[in-house]
A protein has these predicted regions:
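Hydrophobic N-terminal alpha-helices or hydrophobic patches in metabolic proteins across all domains
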Residues: 2-14, 18-323
Length: 323
């Protein structure tokens, strides 16, 4: 049967020994080289690739923040036009302080999973900016910023407090007041009724209390939304600070202590409201500065309690269980 050779010549047979000699392939010309190999021979491309590889870590974070500029523009407008409280600036400042404190420890090789998540969230925030509510799109954008920061931070930094600060940087107090303000006022009024009933004749109707014949309304500032924000902000900041001295403190420790933070905030808001209502029911017409003094005193006590909860030394866990 004849043998057909496609594309390659048949092997040569030695006349003396009858052995089949391997066919030598012709040397490759530059046209046969892979495209990447040809690019690597271009000096300009190599120097450009080296400059990208040696770019400082802060430059990538700055580029990520620049890509999210529509979100920051919207946040600035919402904070400055009076439609929301500018407390989110504190959370952004805390994230900036965290990055600055670890500027010499930023990873030269970022964690690819978090970097991919940052890129995906950035694309999602850009694509949905005109299709989702502004607050939802901003949430995705700030999660992208947090994921990018986590990608470059040292592995020992807890992830959960960083994500928490990114959420708290949103201008969301007005939205929380709209959706959760009334339920919180009802819960606060009912808890205050239990405490006041020991000394006064109290009845509750919605978010209002009838104390000894005096109608006292638990208004929006008494809902505790701002105390909730400040409480969780304190928890995130103290957790990141505590971890500098207690390496066993991780994201799991932070999450397991969050319920205690919620309880402290709720108790503090109930105590503040009870003191103010008791003063009004007793005929003490407290001035505005007295209301503020009571509120700030209770807030300071709540934040101190949260700092104590988050600052407790964490038990040392096995390496496989740390996050």
């Amino acid at each position: 049967m004849p043998t057909f050779w496609f594309n390659h010549p048949p092997p040569q047979t030695s006349a003396s020994s009858g052995a089949v000699e391997p066919t030598q392939r012709p040397p490759q010309t530059p046209l046969h080289q892979p495209r990447l190999s040809r690019l690597l021979q271009v000096p300009g491309f190599v120097s450009f690739a080296v400059r990208i590889d040696r770019a400082p870590e802060w430059l990538w974070l700055a580029l990520l923040a620049a890509a999210l500029w529509p979100t920051f523009w919207w946040m600035g407008q919402r904070m400055m036009d009076g439609s929301d409280e500018p407390l989110g600036l504190l959370a952004l400042a805390a994230l900036g302080t965290l990055a600055w404190a670890h500027r010499r420890e930023l990873r030269a090789a970022p964690r690819l999973g978090w970097l991919a998540l940052a890129l995906a969230c950035t694309l999602a925030a850009t694509a949905t900016r005109t299709h989702l509510p502004d607050l939802a799109s901003a949430l995705v954008a700030l999660l992208a910023l947090a994921a990018g920061l986590v990608a470059f931070l040292p592995a020992r930094i807890s992830i959960a407090p960083v994500l928490g600060l990114s959420v708290l940087s949103l201008p969301l107090l007005a939205s929380l007041q709209f959706y959760a303000g009334y339920p919180l006022r009802v819960v606060t009024a009912e808890a205050s009724r239990w405490l006041l009933a020991m000394q006064h004749d109290v009845a509750r109707s919605g978010a209002s209390l009838m104390v000894n014949g005096h109608l006292v309304i638990v208004d929006a500032p008494c809902s505790g939304v701002q105390m909730v924000w400040l409480g969780y902000f304190t928890a995130c900041v103290v957790a990141l600070y505590t971890q500098r001295f207690n390496r066993a403190f991780n994201s799991r420790t932070f999450i397991t202590r969050l319920p205690a933070v919620s309880v402290l905030v709720l108790v503090g808001n109930v105590v503040r409201n009870t003191l103010l209502v008791a003063g009004e029911a007793s005929g003490w017409h407290l001035r505005g500065w007295a209301h503020d003094a009571v509120g700030l005193t209770v807030l300071a006590a709540v934040c101190a309690g949260i700092a104590g909860v988050m600052g407790r030394p964490a038990p040392v866990l096995a390496p496989s269980t740390q996050l």
